[in-house]
Amino acid sequence: MCDGLVARAARQYSTLLYTPEHFVELLFWVEDKRFAVHPGMDPIAVMRALVFNLRQRGALQGASTIAQQLYTIRLGRSGKVCRSLVYKMKQLSWSMYASAAKSKASILDEYVSTVYWGRSYHGLDKAAEGYFNATRASLSVTQSFFLAERLAAPNRVSVRRVSNLLGRAPIKLTLTRNGATLPEIISLYERIYGCGGEMWQFLGK
């Protein structure tokens, strides 16, 4: 059911954002797959993250929806303060209020227009131009995957994380359906970060 939900949401919002459908679809799969239906927070993701954090006995982290991330972007916060219980409660409260008061399209538009993609690139237009000398409308599916993957840790690359994402069935389907190949994706990471060989090793190819 989630596959159809993400696909329908991607079709809807890509038109509003003048952005390729495959970019929006990959963004949802990587960052917030229930964006179209949750009230600003994702109860399922919160429960999974809570169980994980209790097991790890560490700071609260994970499960942040696009609306929750937008709250952090607006405040310009980062680091441990964003993982404190008090901060998380404020973030949840604001994201639910914003999701009730604003349209989902406006939340998504503000997010992609302001979020940090690394290398001093804030917003999708700057990231597309800076990394690929492209516009948001001309992004290929390989470039879209790269940008969606970058959001979690824009200042560093994790070969393990990239490989895990490439192994997820919905992401793999979106990539192959739009003509992307594994060598093409790895070549892009090699060109930008020089980690192509490590990725091939990690993937066992």
Model-identified regions with their sequence ranges:
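Juxtamembrane regions of bacterial inner-membrane/periplasmic proteins
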Residues: 1-205
